[in-house]
Each structure stands twice: as structure tokens, then as C-alpha cells.
């Protein structure tokens, strides 16, 4: 349908598996999934009962190219501007906590949107409030940090495990009960931070006070499902860094992701944009009317 009416192709092709993995562990419309900017929400729309209406995408009275609350209860937030998604997710998380709910809250934000100050303001808020929220960084361009082999993967699994987190909490509580224990806890934390600095690529987020996991393959559904399941169980702010490829599955879009980011109607075989139908723009109509009135 994107080839017929135009739209955001490369970004959506790059997040198909990611969206499917989130849907596998979330329950809609009870759970809340927010797409920062929102132009990568096509798969979400198809999976939430709008498949048959997809041919109306970006048409008058048809499906919007972005999430819309008045279009479906599964769209939690009307996005369109960048860097606002984490703030919205934090708001949903706090509202859930205050009302005694148990719904899952997640936000998908691109690496480009992390250039906006509002995103970091929200991350700082999440770290302070300690509310359960999963922030998925869809990294399809900027290298936030490279995986350090199998050891990094092993550390990710340990830090998401219940046994590790329960033991960590118990040891901290015991040590903080005495003056000597507090000194020991301080030394242990310093040692842990030094180790993480070397092995954990998202140390910046860890310094904020948010658990970081990744990078993981954004096209490996099983790995993402397992990671998301563990993350939601921990009930605290967690950043999951996934690496994706814009335009995944369509050769032209993979090779020219910027060109196919937002594209006019095109031929799927050749990848070339179709000649636009000649229509009069507002300026043309205005000029003709003024000439006619002056005659």
C-alpha cells in the first residue's frame, strides 16, 4: 500500500520484528505502547485490527500515517513530533502506579530522537521515580555502543535475571544496616561500576540510574521476546537497545534508506517514484481567480 499512496517505508520495514516481539508480550489495549514520532507504527496498526483498512492509509477519512487515539484504543498517544515519547510513557507509568494498575508501558524511540533534550529530561525523571517502564531504543544509524562479544550478552542475561536482582537487593539492605557495611557497599559499587564501564556500552544510561541492556539484534524475534519478558517482570525503568536495519527486506530501501524514509507512490519492481498527477496547487488557483476577477 505504501507503493500506491506513498508513506514512510524504510522505517517501518526496519521495525517489523521489533513490533511483533512487543506484541507477543503485551496485551492491547490494556497495555500501552508509544511510538516516538510515530511514523514507524504501520505494523502496530496491522496487528491491532486495521489490516483490512490499510489500503486507506494516508487517504481522506482513512488510516492516519501516525498513531491516533480516536482511530483505535490500541494507540496510546498521538505522536508526530520527535523526542516526546518517553515523557508520555512516564506519564502513563505514574498514572498506573497511582491507580494501582498493572498494565505494561513501553516506548519505542529512534536514535535520532535522542538528540532532543525532552527525551533526556524524561529519562532523568524515570530514574528518579523508579517507575516500571521499558524504553526501547531503535538504533538504525548511530552507533551508541558496540557489543563486546559473548561476555556482554552474558552480562545482559544476568542483570535481567530475578535471582541476580533479588540477591543484589538483599545484600544492599544487609550492608546498609551498619557503618562498616556502608563502606563495604561503597567499595563494591565502585568496583561494579568500573567493570560495567568496560563491558556495558550503555554506561551513560546506567549513570542516570536506569538499567541498560543491549545492543541486541532487532530482527531476532525470539531474542527480543525473551528480553522484553524479563524486562517487564522487573518493574523498574529499563532501556533496551536494539539494532535494526532501515528498509529491511526490500533491497532498494535497504540500500537507500533515506530516499525511502518518506516516499511518494513508486514502482515496487524498479523502486522508482511514479510521475505525480498534475494537480493545481493553492497558488495556481488563487492566481487564476485573481486574474478572472480583474478582467
Feature roles, as predicted:
Residues 3, 7, 24-28, 52, ...:
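Generic secondary-structure signature for well-ordered alpha-helical cores
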Residues 1-48, 204-228, 234-242:
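N-terminal amphipathic, basic-rich helices that act as targeting or association modules
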Residues 1-7, 71-78, 210-214, 271-276, ...:
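Glycine- and acidic
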Residues 36, 108-109, 134-138, 241-245:
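Short beta-strand segments
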Residues 8-129, 282-295:
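Cofactor-binding active-site loop characterized by glycine-rich and histidine/acidic residues
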Residues 105, 133-134, 212, 238:
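Hydrophobic anchor at the start of a short beta-strand
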Residues 116-138, 152-161, 253:
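A short alpha/beta connector and helix-capping loop motif
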Residues 140-289:
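Long, well-ordered, tryptophan-enriched scaffold segments
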